[in-house]
Curated annotation (Swiss-Prot):
Region (Domain III), start-end ranges: 147-196
Name listed for the protein in its UniProt record: Holliday junction branch migration complex subunit RuvA
Span list, region Domain I: 1-63
Described function: The RuvA-RuvB-RuvC complex processes Holliday junction (HJ) DNA during genetic recombination and DNA repair, while the RuvA-RuvB complex plays an important role in the rescue of blocked DNA replication forks via replication fork reversal (RFR). RuvA specifically binds to HJ cruciform DNA, conferring on it an open structure. The RuvB hexamer acts as an ATP-dependent pump, pulling dsDNA into and through the RuvAB complex. HJ branch migration allows RuvC to scan DNA until it finds its consensus sequence, where it cleaves and resolves the cruciform DNA.
Lineage, highest ranks first: Bacteria, Bacillati, Bacillota, Bacilli, Lactobacillales
């Protein structure tokens, strides 16, 4: 088993990043690959978890040790696999997730991707009182109010009309939040990120 890899991020796609360690490129499936865009071609430390299946060996990557622990807690729940766990983490609401589990808020939990009522109930049963530490870093973050960025909204709507998936665009939009640019430049930058 591996704890983390330290290497150069050589590639970013919509679903994974490639981390080059000692001339070997490892595919790491991560919750939000575009969050690593600022580190492209730079050294990064990524926490990892290996999943061995009959047909594949997969590596999942995490920005922090806490994020990795949350992932491990989620996949311990019956009905939640690695892909679903990553989708939940990608929603970027770890504090809300932990709070909903502690308060047994089934309705809130079903708002997360791929989580139905039965799985939400299982999450409460299995994780209540166990995931506070994993969620605490997210809880400590002060909420940031971002002003409406009309240019960014226009760019995302245009790309949606071009046929790009909403899930991919959501990740890209999150990366650009807090910046100011023209819709045209946002589209150009987003296209570069999508083709890498």
């Amino acid at each position: 088993m591996y704890e983390y890899f330290k290497g150069i991020i050589s590639k970013i796609t919509a679903k994974y990043i490639v981390l080059e360690v000692n001339s070997i490129g490892y595919i790491l499936h991560v919750a939000n690959p575009y969050a690593y865009s600022g580190q492209l071609h730079q050294e990064a430390k990524v926490y990892v978890h290996q999943v061995v299946r009959e047909d594949a060996e997969l590596l999942y990557g995490f920005a922090t040790e806490e994020e990795k622990q949350l992932f491990l807690s989620l996949i311990s729940v019956s009905g939640i696999g690695p892909v679903s766990a990553l989708a939940i983490i990608a929603a970027d609401d770890n504090a809300g997730l932990v709070q909903a589990i502690e308060q047994k808020n089934i309705t809130y939990l079903t708002k997360f991707p791929k989580i139905g009522k039965k799985t939400a109930q299982q999450m409460v049963l299995d994780l209540e009182g166990k995931v506070v530490a994993a969620g605490s870093p997210a809880e400590s973050k002060a909420p940031v109010q971002t002003a409406d960025n009309q240019e960014l909204e226009e760019a995302m709507e245009a790309m949606l009309a071009l046929g790009y998936k909403a899930a991919e665009l959501k990740k890209i939009k999150k990366f650009f939040e807090g910046t100011t640019d023209t819709a045209e430049n946002y589209i150009k930058s987003a296209l570069k990120m999508l083709v890498k």
